Amino acid sequence: MAGSTEERPFSDIITSIRYWVIHSITIPSLFVSGWLFVSTGLAYDVFGTPRPNEYFTEDRQDIPLITDRFNALEQLNQYTK
């Protein structure tokens, strides 16, 4: 008995009304929630990345680049001062 897994064919799924009723709501809501996540700045807070205006400070105008992997913690402390 080869070839049949008793699953619905993909063409049946994407041509059904039920599929489009569900996905016409979920797909746009994913885009809207992603846009809100980024535009409100929550993405910066969640992932801990600096905001565009926080890369350079008045005291430090060089690029905050970690160059020594064995003294990385010291370099991080220096950049966060």
Swiss-Prot record:
GO terms for biological process: photosynthetic electron transport chain. Heterodimer of an alpha subunit and a beta subunit. PSII is composed of 1 copy each of membrane proteins PsbA, PsbB, PsbC, PsbD, PsbE, PsbF, PsbH, PsbI, PsbJ, PsbK, PsbL, PsbM, PsbT, PsbX, PsbY, PsbZ, Psb30/Ycf12, at least 3 peripheral proteins of the oxygen-evolving complex and a large number of cofactors. It forms dimeric complexes. Belongs to the PsbE/PsbF family. The keyword Thylakoid applies. The gene is psbE. It comes from Mesostigma viride. It holds the Pfam family Cytochrom_B559. Its main location: plastid. GO terms for cellular component: chloroplast thylakoid membrane; photosystem II reaction center. The keyword Thylakoid applies. HAMAP family: PSII_PsbE (MF_00642). With its partner (PsbF) binds heme. PSII binds additional chlorophylls, carotenoids and specific lipids. GO terms for molecular function: electron transfer activity; heme binding; iron ion binding. Its cofactor is heme b. It comes from the Eukaryota. It is found in: Plastid, Chloroplast thylakoid membrane. It is a single-pass membrane protein. This is Cytochrome b559 subunit alpha. The chain crosses the membrane at residues 21-35. Heme binds at H23. Keywords: Chloroplast, Electron transport, Heme, Iron, Membrane, Metal-binding, Photosynthesis, Photosystem II, Plastid, Thylakoid, Transmembrane, Transmembrane helix, Transport. PANTHER family: CYTOCHROME B559 SUBUNIT BETA-RELATED (PTHR33391:SF9). This b-type cytochrome is tightly associated with the reaction center of photosystem II (PSII). PSII is a light-driven water:plastoquinone oxidoreductase that uses light energy to abstract electrons from H(2)O, generating O(2) and a proton gradient subsequently used for ATP formation. It consists of a core antenna complex that captures photons, and an electron transfer chain that converts photonic excitation into a charge separation.
